[in-house]
Amino acid sequence: TDGKERNWDWDADWQSAASIQDGVWYSETFIPWSIASMKTQAGEKRKIRMAFYRMLMGIGRGFSTIKGSVYENVYLSVFDEFEFNNYSGSKLDFFPYTTLTDDFTNSDQISKAGAEVFWKIDSSKQLNLTLNPDFGQVESDEVVVNFSAFETFYSDKRPFFAENNSMFDVSDRMHRIINTRRIGGRPDYDCGSYGDLQDYCQQTKAETSEIDFALKYTQKGEVDFGFMSASERDEKFSEGRDFYALRLNTKSNDLKYGYLGTYVNKPVTGNNSQV
């Protein structure tokens, strides 16, 4: 991050509770160390920066513990500094699922099973894996009427792709090399190559692709490292695409150096993409 970016899709595992006693409003929040990736630090103590905001929507005002705004060029650096014990732990979350769909009209029954694994190896390393994911529980996108010549950008709300995705961002939020919403998007077709089945191919085109698996590894340190891979399932009259991304990033004094490489294998069209 450049110190002033916000992520509205961040949905970490934290707990909070509020109460009113003697006319005073209290709020307590439990934030586990595993909530975010942090660079490895030597020694028994770790220094971190924090700030707290409270928004009063009724009057359109916000109150903060710091003298700074996300709209200013300098933001994270003005956070208050705290020192804690240098704790490092590991956490493993496993979310299996199974679904059964019964189509009475076509007398068709479809069953699916899969799982998502989130392994926080330590404070700086994390490995995420999803097998045959089901993203049916993800909230729908807002309706946007767009008459411009440019495509509307929708952020990815799927948990696997949303978590630690900022590792693969470059420059600012308006300059995106990777759009994970493409993964699992509309399949590629070449119906003209199927002869007598061309019309049937046109009629059975799918709007989305199933994902066989996806893997993401991120590591924070002197050199930040990230790798992501995803493979789509072959559909009727279509072959799934394969996606790869590699990210390296480091800082030296006031300069930041980075590399982002992406590759997409498109077996149907043969137009493989490499950036």
Feature roles, as predicted:
Residues 266:
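Short acidic loop-to-helix transition motifs that present clustered carboxylates
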